[in-house]
Amino acid sequence: MGQDQTKQQIEKGLHLYQSNQTEKALQVWMRVLEKSADPAGRFRVLGCLITAHAEMGRYKDMLKFAVVQIDTARELEDPNYLTEGYLNLARSNEKLCEFQKTISYCKTCLNMQGTTVSLQLNGQVSLSMGNAFLGLSIFQKALECFEKALRYAHNNDDKMLECRVCCSLGNFYAQIKDYEKALFFPCKAAELVNDYGAGWSLKYRAMSQYHMAVAYRKLGRLADAMDCCEESMKIALQHGDRPLQALCLLCFADIHLSRRDVQTAFPRYDSAMSIMTEIGNRLGQIQVLLGVAKCWMIQKELDKALESIEKAQELAEGLGNKLGLLKLHCLCERIYRTKGLQQELRDHVVKFHECVEEMELYCGMCGESIGEKNNQLQALPCSHFFHLKCLQTNGTRGCPNCRRLSVKPGYV
């Protein structure tokens, strides 16, 4: 298959894919991959296969194609192809929650400066890197990457990238409990979809609605959360988007948990867990297990709650997800307090505070913790964040956290 025929078949596959005939599109692309003698065409068709498998949640296949794509890029001996290939490797590992590998591949991309593609892709690389740092609960670096990605989006007038970054920022602020910003950013993403997204994939709309649902639930606006989550789920089902279906099921379960309707929450947690296990979303599995533990706690089934927490702990330690560990120590603290087991209670209190220290989840001005309850936060240009009220009260003559870090232990 020559260059022109390869190009024609790739377009045919894209047309099928956009009209929701995914399996037929995959067949066309696989045929191109087998028969095309044109390396640049093979590279492009691998890109299509990577995107399609990502959207279906077939992350292991996505990674497999990304590895073949890197080999094709090396064959082409073109740094532009290599940059794109490494970004796809980074993304595949991000989806499989291999966050250290993601960061490493992203750094490789950023080191390949000077290529024309790198200038277009730097924003996407920064976004993927930010998501990986967030998965590891390294909040300052995550925020730094998201802000960099947002700058690239603004400078290149890339509204799609801006939309994706806004969703990630929504997730970031939901985790550290500034719920006002957790809602603001996905609302901004939804606005971008309305204003510019006529020709975009519907996944952008679905994604922004899902993140709005999460924020509404955390703000206690459960009816609004349900509406947004239903809208997102509808699109996810139409498009066979398994990863998003799993997240929506988790969100539905969390909404029912907020209503203390444990019987309705349980089957939704089970369905979410089943998809997340199938696709390899271990970060999502931790959230499901913590939700299930809370359900058991409501039912006063404390030993069953501890079983769920134990499974979550194994996953969180494996991934290096410190926020997950902090949350489970917090739940254990409540369980052992109820059981009257003082030694275990003390152990988890100590571990809880170790997690807070490690993640630097406290305000450098007042010393109070961040992420314990809903609080308006404000980041300084260095990406350290503080309580907004502390910055307003004390003003800022530079960042107190940066000042502390610059004082060498030898001079203290």
From Swiss-Prot:
Subcellular location: Cell membrane; Postsynaptic cell membrane; Cytoplasm, Cytoskeleton
Superkingdom in the source lineage: Eukaryota
One GO MF term: protein-membrane adaptor activity
Post-translational modification Phosphotyrosine, affected residues: 196
Tissue: Expressed in muscle fibers and in neurons.
Lipidation feature positions (N-myristoyl glycine): 2
Main location class: membrane
GO cellular component, one term: cytoskeleton
Zinc finger motifs (RING-type), residue ranges: 363-403
Pfam families cross-referenced by the UniProt entry: Rapsyn_N (PF10579), TPR_8 (PF13181), zf-RING_2 (PF13639)
InterPro entries to which the protein is assigned, alphabetical: Postsynaptic, Postsynaptic_CS, RAPsyn, Rapsyn_myristoylation/link_N, TPR-like_helical_dom_sf, TPR_rpt, Znf_RING, Znf_RING/FYVE/PHD
GO terms (BP aspect): positive regulation of neuromuscular synaptic transmission; synaptic transmission, cholinergic
UniProt keywords, alphabetically: Cell membrane, Cytoplasm, Cytoskeleton, Lipoprotein, Membrane, Metal-binding, Myristate, Phosphoprotein, Postsynaptic cell membrane, Repeat, Synapse, TPR repeat, Zinc, Zinc-finger
SMART domains the record matches: RING, TPR
Membrane topology qualifier: Peripheral membrane protein
Residues in TPR repeats: 6-39, 83-116, 123-156, 163-196, 206-239, 246-279, 286-319
Function: Postsynaptic protein required for clustering of nicotinic acetylcholine receptors (nAChRs) at the neuromuscular junction. It may link the receptor to the underlying postsynaptic cytoskeleton, possibly by direct association with actin or spectrin.
The family this protein is said to belong to: Belongs to the RAPsyn family.
Domains (record comment): A cysteine-rich region homologous to part of the regulatory domain of protein kinase C may be important in interactions of this protein with the lipid bilayer.
Name under which the protein is recorded: 43 kDa receptor-associated protein of the synapse
Gene expressing this chain: RAPSN
